[in-house]
Structures are given as structure tokens and as C-alpha cells.
Regions:
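Extracytoplasmic
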Residues: 77-109, 122-125, 284-289
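Paired small-residue
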Residues: 147, 158-167, 356-364
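Helix-loop-helix hairpin linking two adjacent transmembrane segments in secondary transporters
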Residues: 157-159, 188-242, 287, 291
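Cytoplasmic helix-loop-helix junction between adjacent transmembrane helices
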Residues: 163-201
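C-terminal transmembrane helical hairpin of 12-TM major facilitator-type secondary transporters
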Residues: 331-368
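Helix-to-loop junctions at the C-terminal end of transmembrane segments
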Residues: 122-133, 317-329
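Conserved MFS/SLC helix-loop-helix module at the cytosolic interface between two early adjacent transmembrane helices
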Residues: 120-158
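Helix-breaking motifs and short loop linkers at transmembrane-helix boundaries and internal kinks
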Residues: 101, 153-159, 297, 329, ...
Length: 368
């Protein structure tokens, strides 16, 4: 219910401003029925304008919605580049093995080298927290560019291993810093949705990036997908510099203070869910082709279309879960979606011989 005191104070202030305004109307020979005399115009004059160029600090909302959208798009470009860098190996591994004169098993170590880089690079975030998130993101984007260029030009297997390790270093740290930036860019009602938009680049990489990289490798060269990732990383560097506003560093709680949250059980549960989820994704990537071709009866040449459908499920699930988490409890949304995934997996196990049904259930699983 409106406060009567505030309402009467506002009315007195408005009556105090009216004589001066009427004098100005008389001087300019403006009639009382002029649009400038309408209630909407008076309200606009009474509303103070928000200063431009406001720095984004903790707890401060971004006034201009365009700044928020551009910032989130720039962050999503970064996750798109990382998604392509990570998953590009799945479709071009045989081509790399032939190009470098190595076995498939040796080529598989290139995936492990990237994973080791991810594990080594993520802790760097603990020593870089005193800097602005924008500055950290720029450094990480430069590392993404360096790793992609080295992968594209590596002449030997040893150099390719080192290049994949370097390419993996910014992965974990980027997701951590970009999540902080996305939360600080959004208002209180849309923080979860902002993070889902940032992560959407990873799912888009599965939808378009992986099939495109496979086609480029098969028709031109396995080095072309890495050139594409390098160009994308260059765009990420530019868009972060151009579109992401300045964000103040997080408060310094000391080195030990950064790990105080681990005393709670919630972070460990989230870590376990993340480990199991990522492990499941890589198992799915490893065995989806024999499942769909041997059990589902699909021809091998249709696998690229099935992968596009799976990527579409990831995009829809990512964006939908973000919106639902803004409205309901994130824990409740996660529990419901995982229950649907478990049911779909059990149906795939029992009904794998029905190809199109299995394909539809596969999309449901990737959406979850």
C-alpha cells in the first residue's frame, strides 16, 4: 500500500515546481493543452535520469539491458570456442592419426592432454581473483587463441600434445570467471538465466561446431577446424574487450578463505554431479555410434544428422533449465530433469532396437 506521507510530499514537491513550469510555458507561449503539459511529460521531467558509464560492482544492476545482452553474447562466444576446442577431436581423431603418422590409441592421448590442461589451469583462478574479471577473461581468451594456433601448425606428435595441453589450460578458469561475470551483469531475477546463456556456447558447439569440423576435416584437412577455432578465439578476444563492461574484483578473503565454502556439503554434491555428468557425456560420445548403428539400425552416414539432433537437445535443455531455475528452485529443476534422463536411459536400454524411438529418447537425454 502506498505511503500517504511520501505521496503528499511528492504532491507538495510537484505543486512547488508547477509555478516555475507555468512561467516557462508563458514565456514560450505554449498553450495548456500542449503535449508538454501532459501528465506523462510532467512525470518524465520529475524522474531523475540515471548517469551513464556506471561501473558494475557487486550488487549493482546494469541499467542498460543492451550492455547486459552484449556482455553475455561475448561470454557465450568464449564457451563456443572452448566447446569446439574440446569436442573437435571426437570427429577428426582418425584424420589426425593419419596426418601425424600415429595410431588411434596415440591420437586418443591428445584428448587426455587437453583434460590434463583443464585440471592444471582451473586452480589459476585462485591466484588471479584480485584482478578484474574482464582482465582475466582477456588473458584466458589470448591463451585460447595461442592453443588453437599451435594445434593448427603442429608438425609433430609431441608438439601437438603440448599444444593440446596449452589449449586446455584456460577451459576451467574461463567457465569460473565467466560465470561470475554473467551473475554480476544480470539482475536478481535473471542470474541463473544469464549463466545458462553464457554456457549456451558449449551446447551450440555440439549442435553446429562438431559436425562442421568433421566435414572440414574430411573434405579439406584436419588442421582447418583448428584454424576456425583460432579465428573464433580472436573474435572472443575482441568482443570481450568491446562488450564486457568493467567489473570490480571480488573481495579478498585470503587464500584459505577461498576454500571455506568446502566445509558445506553442497559444493561436494555439486562437484559429484558435475563429475558424473561429464563422465556420462564422454561415455555417450564414445558409444553413441555403435548404439545407433548396430542396435538402432541407422546407416553410418546418418550419424552426423543424429549428432545435430543431439546438439539441438542440449541447446533447448540448457536454455529451458535456465528459465525454469529463475522461477523455481535450481535443486528441484535439476532433480526433475535427472529423473527424466534416468527414465529415458532405461527405455533406451530396453527398446534400443526401435531406431527412431531411441533417437527421440537420445534427444531427451541430451536435453536433460
Amino acid at each position: 500500500m502506498p505511503n500517504p506521507t511520501a505521496r503528499h510530499s511528492a504532491a507538495r514537491g510537484q505543486r512547488g515546481q508547477e509555478p516555475a513550469f507555468r512561467i516557462q510555458l508563458h514565456k514560450n507561449k505554449i498553450k495548456p493543452n500542449h503535449p508538454a503539459c501532459s501528465p506523462q511529460a510532467r512525470a518524465a521531467r520529475a524522474t531523475p535520469s540515471r548517469p551513464r558509464g556506471t561501473r558494475v560492482t557487486a550488487g549493482t544492476d546494469v541499467a542498460n539491458i543492451k550492455i547486459m545482452k552484449k556482455g553475455l553474447i561475448a561470454l557465450a562466444f568464449g564457451t563456443l570456442a572452448l566447446g569446439m576446442t574440446e569436442f573437435v577431436m571426437m570427429g577428426i581423431l582418425p584424420d589426425i592419426a593419419r596426418g601425424l603418422g600415429i595410431t588411434i590409441i596415440q591420437a586418443g592421448h591428445l584428448i587426455s592432454a587437453y583434460a590434463i590442461g583443464v585440471c592444471c589451469g582451473a586452480p589459476l583462478l585462485t591466484v588471479a581473483h584480485k584482478y578484474s574479471p574482464k582482465r582475466i577473461l582477456l588473458v584466458l581468451a589470448a591463451m585460447m587463441l595461442l592453443g588453437a594456433v599451435l594445434c593448427a601448425v603442429s608438425p609433430t606428435y609431441g608438439m601437438m600434445l603440448a599444444a593440446r595441453f596449452i589449449a586446455g589450460l584456460p577451459h576451467g578458469a574461463y567457465f569460473g570467471v565467466a560465470s561470475i561475470a554473467a551473475i554480476r551483469l544480470a539482475d536478481e531475477r535473471h542470474k541463473t538465466g544469464a549463466v545458462s546463456i553464457m554456457v549456451a556456447g558449449m551446447t551450440i558447439a555440439n549442435l553446429f561446431g562438431v559436425p562442421l569440423s568433421t566435414a572440414l576435416s574430411g573434405n579439406i584437412s584436419w588442421r582447418v577446424p583448428f584454424v576456425l577455432v583460432a579465428l573464433l578465439s580472436l573474435l572472443v578476444l575482441y568482443y570481450i574487450w568491446k562488450w564486457v563492461p568493467h567489473i570490480d574484483p571480488l573481495p579478498d578473503n585470503g587464500y584459505k578463505g577461498q576454500f571455506r565454502f568446502l566445509r558445506s556439503s553442497a559444493p561436494w554434491l555439486i562437484l559429484a554431479a558435475t563429475m558424473l555428468g561429464n563422465g556420462g557425456i564422454f561415455c555417450w560420445y564414445s558409444y553413441v555410434t555403435p548404439l545407433m548403428t548396430t542396435e538402432g539400425g541407422f546407416p553410418p552416414e546418418t550419424m552426423s544428422l543424429l549428432m545435430v539432433a543431439a546438439g539441438f537437445g542440449m541447446v533447448v535443455g540448457n536454455l529451458t533449465s535456465g528459465r525454469l531455475s529463475d522461477r523455481y528452485s535450481p535443486g528441484r529443476v535439476a532433480a526433475c530433469t535427472q529423473a527424466v534422463v534416468v527414465a529415458a536411459l532405461l527405455l533406451i536400454f530396453a527398446l534400443a532396437q526401435y531406431g527412431w524411438l531411441t533417437a527421440g529418447l537420445m534427444v531427451v537425454c541430451t536435453a536433460g
